[in-house]
């Protein structure tokens, strides 16, 4: 029934005679309920039945039989006790709201207590659950805490509980029951027989009357307020039990404690229970003195500062639940807080997490908390950003002057030993007070307030109405400070109003001035919060001076005036700004008309700021809300914000039982761990040079998270056999230099340098440029959070193309001299670290990422390009290629400082749309002046352009391309979901992390979409363009989404070298200096990047956004999103699990830093070794298809093919089949080959040879599509080898590689890249290349530099080989993981082809090509003979494999000295220091004479990467010099080496 329509009273019998115009009760046309209407006319039908035409109140007419009409009875004739029907008097009554649920009571117990249906129909499920929780504890006579987030309706839940307990019905019955007894007797109705219950509700005064209003709204409660003048009379009524609920304040409770204790309360309900947080406070003592067992606390922030507060609140509600305070501190508080340190050891972290879980279990039955995620679907989007504003020069001078005062010096030295040698601290001995007699503690708070004022606006120091206590102090400070600035003093005297409102005296005011102008243009309505009313005065005067129509609300505003202000602001368009005091406007106000919230200054308590934000961000808000928190850079305000983060993270751990991210080294209250946050030295300090402590801390955590997440995903990607050596994780990092390893070993605990952080974050353009050179000093290869996109800190869902465009641009922007795709690629290759190159995107798989020096030769096939993108111009295609590649590499090469990098889940479709064939340069150069020409050919016109660029660029490009190709291969076999097929490069990072994250936007895109397609003809032009964009957009923030799972942000690492301008044509040939193995690969991506008109429109919108606007504000130094700073992360979850396992289960690594991932127990490793050994013996030919574990293939894949072919209207995608289709086709294959189950078919595939698998694929696919038979054409017969021989050779190579890995920790990088290059060497016949068959043997295990052709080598024991290989892969993880996966659709198919082509490759590798050997120029349609060129190298140098130990280490180095090229076609690699090979290849006496210089020799040897231990390092150096005894010409016996390798491995 429509509740808004009262039900008139009618007689039981209908009236006999009706007349037109009479009032009557007629059935409603909507629901047939009787409602009042009038008779318009009366008619009789042909059957003699009488009908009345009824006119309803809504002017509807209806023909109704007269018999159905009833007479309206006057109210005066009704009996006294039936004045209204139940439905008329129901509470709550919301006429404009529909009932969310059915009108039935909610049973709380079997004895009949229930929430009345009048209330229940408006409740949400979680609110019913909360009422049930309260009722359960009430019945059992014990207390509890309801800790729901703000805005979830704790008040309504309590009222529902009270209604159930008090037996309320929400109808007329409650009215009658509330009547005095004498009236009930007159009505001949017995009073209720149930015992009367009384409840006491204690609330802050600010919400006391709000409770009264809510109780009156939701039910018929007899409520009295014990406060103010009437509290004595009301107290008498309470003693007479004439009320059911008594409302009072904390202060009144203190005054009337004895009277209230004399009463018997059914329960005490305390709102804002976090006020009971200090055990020594008077309010806590009063609350604990209340005589009531059922104590119910309501608080959304039970822990605001430290865990002691939590204990205090819980101990009040449930005395003794958490033990004594000392017990709680020892068992819970200390372990949790110390385990939350960024530098915590595994034991500290594991102990802290275990204590967290124990605490959660203890509190679970007594504490109920839900968060706003329950109602997120009813809330709009919220963007929360921290805006760091630079101080003006005047502010800096004043701030520094305050810090240099004698009083501040007294504060800073107060904890030092007294000069009188008494052994006491200065503040307790001779320096208790200053010259004015003020104690150090008083000075501490006074000067802290002064610094806060200066950080906001210098004019605040001269404002009147200062408290008497500080008046003298402030005057003295002003005299001392402003004595240096007489102009300011004089001006403020002459024109105080102008001075206060002039933004030039405040960096924040400058930002606010432009922000308000921007909001006024966009018709945004702004809520401007400030904690200080004096600051509100300044802001008010500024609004007056600017002619802004504003409203102001603070503590002095009367309650009725508040309602008027809120209504005017929400409804009036002209009023677009409201100045609100943070404390006064924090509760009970509904500013849903505002869509921009500006917090001008932070508070120490995060709850205050959150309450202020919730004034606009709440149910009822229709627009997306933007929250901007202004922070003065480098001042005490930054410490205030970071302490908020510290407290919120601690709250997440203790209250939310989350593995909260560990940002800080500090522990509150600990003298030993004051870290970055606590102690007077952190507060009374001005960070200069524009450095941002917040950025440093967030980036530090981000780098650790990136390493951990890549380590985690790597371990997932690797089959368990590969995890056998995971405990040797330092070996994984040995490929980095000693500095990097030391940094990783200390868990990245130290703050990074300002230069480094400047380049890691999105700062202003000037800072970025300044940091470019310093960035190169960072050891390459370590990746930050941004590059892998793992931390919730900065990233979110990647949705729009426009973000991708921006990231592309930001990539270009990030290197001053390399705007093309080489910039990022080069960086990664220059890293030359297995882990680092590995630590690419989360979306990539780990193929040959570990191959830092690999020669990847990318072959572009014109034919394939035409098939894939026939309609696009060459320029467009080329731009897409470079852009797509650039996108991926942006993330791959993110940061050079990450902790552990093991990438996984790489994808490829966004890679180069055109196959670009890259040849690594022959030499590297450390000298930025020396350049190597990079041959870039355009297939279309056969023009060849020499591009000047650092070898590091080309080398990294090779590495990255190799990585992506092998990642593509990896993808085939591992069951990565289809979502990972697309590399989400459109990272919406709101964090202004590195210049990569700055998401440089192509501004020209707005005017001409074509420019996005057209890549600059020369790199120089691109540099100019990027520089322009960088200047304008270095701080642009992308749209942010608060998703925790979709995290990927680009991060650019910078190089010291000046990257020369490059020209990009359709075909790019890049050379890189390599070791013996060379690889050839041709790669075709699935998807080009699309720049649509829609993306241009979106781009235009973003350009007009507030983010774009803020980016152009000069005073904005840094912006980061606050969206995902608070809370846990997947990386932290992994670290916590690993720590708990290592400490409590495996009893190992307990003192290692928790941020180091050491995995897998020894017993597990031995078990897995045994399993693998047994299985490999069974599957004697180590075929690529043999799969030992779900999702993974146990042995290296010899090759993987990625290909897209189009025949007529059908497109065949080879090697990139989506996961779901692969699974389906695998099942179809099982049926096709008449096998009983998929498992049986899998075993058959596992045991089959390469030819057999290829035949199976051919038979299956040709049965459905005969035209694909041509895809299975074998390579020339002379190259054919049996699959089993291939498999054995893979084992040998794996074993040799393993031995090298064990002896030489740093060799894994060089070998890994050699692995890729060997397999990609251009050995294939031209005919194969022309057919676009993508051939590369991705033997990730073939890291051995010299692979003999002897048959004996091929016949080594498989089990032994696999064992060594497994251990090797676990460390390096390079190509193995990627090569380990075989696409069930195309893996075997391509395997056969490439194995046939492998014989020539084997001949090539058996020659032992040196790392400096010439690189072969391979054109698109002409293949030079690499064997001939290789022979020339052998003729010059002979078998150089014996020097592998000596020269391997320098492949890890980021740079190379220049050296001469042996032939014109050879190109140099740069960014790598010179080693012996470089000197030998320099055919001049000067270079060779360097070998006689002992200093040069020592320098070369010192560049060996820091090993996992000093012992390993000594062994390494010893092996280097011992290897020289054999020198160049001694032949290498592969079988002997394999045996020695195995022994070394043992």
UniProtKB/Swiss-Prot annotation:
Its main location: nucleus. It is found in: Nucleus; Cytoplasm, Cytoskeleton, Microtubule organizing center, Centrosome; Mitochondrion; Chromosome, Centromere. Keywords: ATP-binding, Centromere, Chromosome, Cytoplasm, Cytoskeleton, DNA damage, DNA repair, DNA-binding, Helicase, Hydrolase, Mitochondrion, Nucleotide-binding, Nucleus, Phosphoprotein. It holds the Pfam family Helicase_C. Its EC number is 3.6.4.-. The modification Phosphoserine is found at residues 977, 980, 1370, 1373. GO terms for molecular function: ATP binding; DNA binding; helicase activity; hydrolase activity. ATP binds at residues 148-155. A motif (Atypical PIP-box) lies at residues 780-791. Coiled coil: none annotated. GO terms for cellular component: centrosome; chromosome, centromeric region; mitochondrion; nucleus. GO terms for biological process: DNA damage response; interstrand cross-link repair. Residues 511-661 form the Helicase C-terminal domain. Residues 8-22, 1283-1300 have a biased composition (Basic and acidic residues). A motif (DEAH box) lies at residues 271-274. Residues 1-22, 918-949, 1279-1314, 1361-1382 are annotated as: Disordered. SMART domains: DEXDc (SM00487), HELICc (SM00490). The keyword Ubl conjugation does not apply. Phosphorylated by NEK6. InterPro entries: DNA/RNA_helicase_DEAH_CS, Helicase_ATP-bd, Helicase_C-like, Heliccase-ass-bd, P-loop_NTPase, SNF2-like_sf, SNF2/RAD54-like_C, SNF2_N. Residues 135-320 form the Helicase ATP-binding domain. Interacts with NEK6. Interacts (via an atypical PIP-box) with PCNA; this interaction facilitates cenrtomeric localization of ERCC6L2. Interacts with CYREN; this interaction is DNA independent. Interacts with XRCC6 and XRCC5. Belongs to the SNF2/RAD54 helicase family. The atypical PIP-box motif mediates interaction with PCNA. The helicase C-terminal domaine drives nuclear localization and recruitment to damaged sites. Promotes double-strand break (DSB) end-joining and facilitates programmed recombination by controlling how DNA ends are joined in a spatially oriented manner during repair. Also plays a role in DNA repair by restricting DNA end resection in double strand break (DSB) repair. Facilitates replication of complex DNA regions and regulates the maintenance of chromatin structure. This is DNA excision repair protein ERCC-6-like 2.
């Amino acid at each position: 029934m429509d509740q808004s329509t009262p039900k008139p009273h009618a007689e039981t019998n209908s009236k006999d005679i009706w007349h037109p115009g009479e009032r009557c009760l007629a059935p409603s046309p909507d629901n047939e309920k009787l409602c009042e209407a009038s008779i318009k006319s009366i008619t009789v039908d042909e059957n003699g039945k009488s009908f009345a035409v009824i006119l309803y109140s809504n002017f509807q007419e209806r023909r109704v039989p007269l018999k159905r009409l009833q007479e309206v009875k006057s109210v005066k004739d009704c009996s006294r006790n039936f004045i209204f029907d139940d439905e008329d008097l129901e509470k709550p009554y919301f006429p404009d709201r529909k009932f969310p649920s059915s009108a039935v009571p909610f049973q709380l117990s079997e004895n009949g207590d229930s929430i009345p249906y009048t209330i229940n129909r408006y409740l949400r499920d979680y609110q019913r659950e909360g009422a049930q929780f309260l009722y359960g504890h009430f019945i059992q006579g014990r207390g509890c805490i309801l800790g729901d987030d703000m805005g979830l309706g704790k008040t309504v839940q309590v009222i529902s509980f009270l209604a159930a307990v008090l037996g309320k019905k929400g109808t007329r019955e409650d009215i009658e029951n509330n009547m005095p007894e004498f009236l009930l007797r007159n009505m001949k109705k017995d009073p209720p027989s149930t015992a009367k219950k009384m409840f006491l509700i204690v609330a802050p005064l600010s919400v006391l009357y709000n409770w009264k209003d809510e109780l009156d709204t939701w039910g018929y409660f007899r409520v009295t307020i014990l406060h103010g003048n009437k509290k004595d009379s009301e107290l008498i009524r309470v003693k007479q039990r004439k009320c059911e609920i008594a409302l009072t304040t904390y202060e009144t409770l203190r005054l009337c404690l004895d009277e209230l204790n004399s009463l018997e309360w059914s329960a005490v309900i305390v709102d804002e229970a976090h006020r009971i947080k200090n055990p020594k406070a008077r309010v806590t003592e009063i609350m604990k003195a209340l005589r009531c067992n059922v104590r119910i606390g309501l608080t959304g922030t039970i822990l605001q500062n430290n865990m002691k507060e939590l204990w205090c609140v819980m101990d009040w509600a449930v005395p003794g639940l958490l033990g004594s305070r000392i017990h709680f501190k020892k068992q819970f508080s200390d372990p949790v807080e110390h385990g939350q340190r960024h530098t915590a050891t595994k034991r500290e972290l594991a102990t802290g997490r275990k204590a967290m879980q124990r605490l959660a279990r203890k509190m679970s039955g007594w504490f109920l908390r839900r968060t706003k995620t329950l109602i997120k679907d009813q809330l709009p989007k919220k963007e929360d950003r921290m805006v760091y504003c630079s101080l003006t020069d005047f502010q800096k001078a004043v701030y520094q002057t305050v810090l240099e005062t004698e009083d501040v010096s007294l504060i800073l030295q107060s904890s030092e030993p007294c000069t009188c040698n008494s052994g006491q601290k200065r503040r307790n001995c001779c320096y208790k007070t200053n010259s004015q007699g003020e104690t150090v503690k008083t000075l501490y708070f006074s000067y802290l307030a002064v610094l806060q004022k200066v950080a906001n606006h210098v004019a605040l120091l001269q404002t009147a109405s200062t408290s008497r206590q500080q008046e003298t102090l402030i005057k003295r400070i002003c005299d001392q400070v402003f004595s240096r600035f007489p102009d300011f003093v004089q001006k403020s005297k002459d024109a105080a109003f102008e001075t206060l409102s002039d933004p030039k005296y405040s960096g924040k005011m400058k930002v606010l001035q432009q922000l308000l102008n921007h909001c006024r243009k966009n018709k945004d309505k702004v809520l401007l919060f400030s904690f200080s009313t004096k600051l509100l005065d300044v802001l008010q005067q500024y609004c007056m001076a600017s002619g802004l129509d504003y409203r102001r609300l603070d503590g002095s505003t009367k309650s009725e005036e508040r309602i008027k202000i809120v209504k005017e602001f929400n409804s009036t368009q002209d009023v677009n700004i409201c100045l609100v005091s943070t404390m006064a406007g924090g509760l009970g106000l509904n500013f849903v008309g505002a869509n921009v919230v500006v917090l001008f200054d932070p508070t120490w308590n995060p709850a205050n700021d959150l309450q202020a934000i919730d004034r606009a961000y709440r149910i009822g808000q229709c627009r997306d809300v933007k929250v901007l928190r202004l922070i003065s850079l480098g001042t005490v305000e930054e410490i205030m914000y970071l302490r908020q983060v510290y407290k919120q993270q601690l709250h997440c751990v203790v209250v939310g039982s989350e593995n909260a991210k560990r940002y800080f080294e500090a522990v509150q209250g600990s003298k030993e761990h004051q870290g970055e946050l606590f102690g007077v030295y952190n507060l009374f300090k001005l960070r200069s040079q524009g450095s941002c402590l917040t950025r440093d801390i967030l980036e530090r955590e981000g780098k650790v998270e990136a390493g951990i997440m890549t380590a985690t995903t790597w371990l997932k990607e690797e089959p368990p056999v590969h995890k056998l050596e995971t405990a040797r994780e330092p070996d994984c990092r040995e490929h980095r230099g000693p500095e990097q390893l030391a940094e990783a070993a200390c868990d990245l605990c130290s703050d990074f340098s300002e230069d480094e952080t400047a380049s890691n974050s999105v700062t202003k353009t000037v800072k970025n440029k300044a940091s470019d050179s310093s960035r190169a000093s960072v050891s390459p290869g370590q990746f930050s959070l941004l590059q892998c996109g793992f931390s919730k800190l900065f990233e979110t869902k990647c949705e729009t193309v426009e973000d991708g465009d921006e990231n592309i641009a930001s990539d270009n922007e990030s290197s001053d001299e390399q705007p093309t795709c080489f910039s990022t690629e080069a960086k990664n290759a220059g890293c030359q670290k297995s882990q680092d190159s590995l630590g690419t995107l989360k979306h990539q798989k780990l193929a040959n990422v570990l191959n830092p020096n690999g020669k990847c030769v990318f072959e572009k096939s014109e034919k394939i390009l035409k098939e894939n993108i026939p309609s696009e111009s060459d320029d467009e295609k080329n731009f897409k290629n470079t852009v797509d590649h650039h996108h991926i590499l942006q993330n791959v090469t993110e940061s050079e400082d990450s902790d552990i990098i093991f990438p996984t889940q790489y994808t490829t479709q966004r890679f180069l749309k055109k196959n670009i064939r890259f040849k690594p340069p022959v030499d590297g150069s450390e000298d930025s002046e020396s350049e190597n020409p990079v041959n870039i050919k355009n297939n279309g016109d056969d023009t060849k352009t020499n591009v000047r660029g650092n070898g590091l660029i080309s080398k990294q490009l090779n590495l990255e391309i190799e990585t992506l190709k092998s990642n593509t291969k990896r993808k085939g076999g591992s069951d990565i979901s289809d979502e990972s097929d697309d590399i989400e490069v459109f990272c919406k990072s709101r964090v202004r992390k590195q210049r990569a994250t700055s998401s440089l936007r192509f501004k020209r895109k707005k005017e001409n979409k074509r420019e996005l397609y057209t890549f600059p003809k020369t790199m120089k032009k691109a540099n100019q363009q990027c520089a322009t964009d960088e200047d304008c957009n270095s701080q642009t923030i992308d749209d942010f989404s608060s998703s925790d799972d979709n995290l990927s942000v680009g991060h650019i690492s910078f190089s010291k070298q000046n990257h020369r301008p490059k020209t990009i044509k359709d075909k790019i040939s890049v050379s890189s200096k390599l070791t013996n193995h060379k690889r050839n690969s041709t790669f075709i991506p699935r998807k080009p990047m699309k720049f649509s008109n829609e993306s241009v429109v979106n781009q235009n919108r973003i350009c007009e956004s507030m983010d774009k606007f803020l980016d152009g504000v000069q005073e904005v130094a840094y912006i980061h999103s606050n969206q995902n700073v608070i809370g846990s992360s997947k990386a932290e979850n992994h670290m916590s699990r690993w720590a708990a396992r290592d400490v409590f289960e495996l009893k190992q690594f307990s003192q290692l830093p928790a941020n180091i991932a050491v995995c897998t127990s020894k017993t597990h490793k031995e078990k897995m070794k045994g399993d693998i050994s047994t299985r490999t013996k069974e599957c004697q030919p180590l075929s690529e298809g043999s799969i030992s574990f779900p999702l993974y293939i146990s042995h290296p894949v010899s090759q993987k093919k990625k290909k897209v072919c189009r025949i007529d209207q059908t497109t065949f995608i080879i090697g990139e089949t989506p996961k779901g289709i692969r699974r389906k086709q695998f099942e179809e294959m099982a049926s096709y080959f008449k096998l009983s189950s998929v498992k049986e078919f899998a075993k058959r595939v596992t045991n089959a040879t390469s030819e057999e698998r290829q035949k199976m694929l051919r038979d299956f696919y040709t049965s459905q599509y005969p035209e694909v038979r041509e895809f299975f054409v074998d390579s020339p017969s002379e190259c054919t080898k049996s699959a089993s021989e291939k498999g054995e050779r893979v084992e040998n190579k794996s074993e040799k590689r393993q031995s090298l890995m064990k002896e030489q920790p740093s060799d894994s990088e060089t070998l890994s890249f050699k692995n890729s290059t060997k397999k990609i060497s251009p050995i294939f016949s031209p005919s194969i290349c022309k057919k676009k068959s993508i051939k590369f043997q991705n033997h990730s295990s073939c890291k051995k530099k010299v692979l003999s052709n002897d048959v004996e080598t091929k016949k080594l024991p498989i089990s032994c080989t696999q064992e060594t290989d497994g251990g090797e892969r676990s460390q390096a993880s390079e190509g193995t993981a990627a090569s380990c996966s075989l696409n069930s659709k195309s893996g075997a198919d391509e395997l056969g082809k490439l194995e046939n082509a492998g014989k020539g490759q084997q001949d090539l590798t058996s020659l032992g090509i040196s790392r400096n050997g010439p690189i072969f120029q391979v054109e698109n349609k002409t293949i030079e003979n690499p064997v001939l060129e290789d022979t020339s190298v052998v003729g010059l140098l002979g078998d150089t494999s014996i020097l592998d130990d000596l020269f391997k280490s320098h492949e890890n180095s980021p740079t190379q000295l220049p050296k001469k090229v042996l032939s014109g076609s050879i190109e140099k690699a740069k960014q790598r220091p010179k080693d012996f090979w470089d000197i030998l290849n320099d055919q001049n006496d000067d270079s060779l004479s360097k070998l006689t210089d002992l200093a040069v020799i020592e320098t070369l040897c010192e560049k060996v990467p820091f090993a996992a231990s000093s012992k390993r390092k000594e062994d390494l150096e010893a092996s280097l010099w011992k290897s020289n005894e054999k020198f160049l010409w001694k032949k290498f016996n592969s079988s002997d080496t394999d045996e020695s390798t195995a022994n070394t491995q043992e």
